[in-house]
Amino acid sequence: MQKGVDDISFRACWIAALTDPEKLGTLSRERAANPRLQKCIYWLATVKQRGGDPAKIIDDANEQNKVSGKPYGEFVKAQLLRNLKIAEELGLINPEGLAELRKGNCATITLGPYKGEEATADHIIPRAACPELDNQIFNLELLPATLNSSKSDKIGDRQLDFAKKLNSVGLLSAKGLEAVLAKGKR
């Protein structure tokens, strides 16, 4: 048996709890999913450090949440893996960064032009444009704090395309899509 496999499999339970669509649907505080994203990055990074496959852990978590093979599960998986890559590129995967991420806090960037800034969780489609996506893990990404604040609630081509994709698979309502499209036309 591979060293740490049981420990690694245990992490799938954490990812499942943090990405459970039913639990996320009950969050009422604005931006309540942001710390959940940061905690997921912690668990996935520690899986990778122990020789595990983060994609497999997400698959296991999706299976536990009964979203395996469904659009929700696929979007969560893609976004978590993307955020893990971003965390690695920003130099967040170190003892200090992992300690912050484990608590659901912002970690300090240690690599690249934003070195010294905090990496914050931000909405791909801003909550001001579409509140129904506020607490969805698949709508969150890590960004340097200055980029996050300068982005504001702008809707560009990326957000429009993402909204259309989400709507086409039933993860964004027609009303939500209309709101994003209207914001994007300004």
Residue ranges and their predicted role:
Residues 107-142:
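Histidine-centered nuclease catalytic patch
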Residues 1-115, 150-186:
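Nuclease and nuclease-like effector domains acting on nucleic acids or nucleotide cofactors
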Residues 145:
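Cys/His/Pro-rich metal-binding microdomains
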Residues 127, 149-150:
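Activation segment
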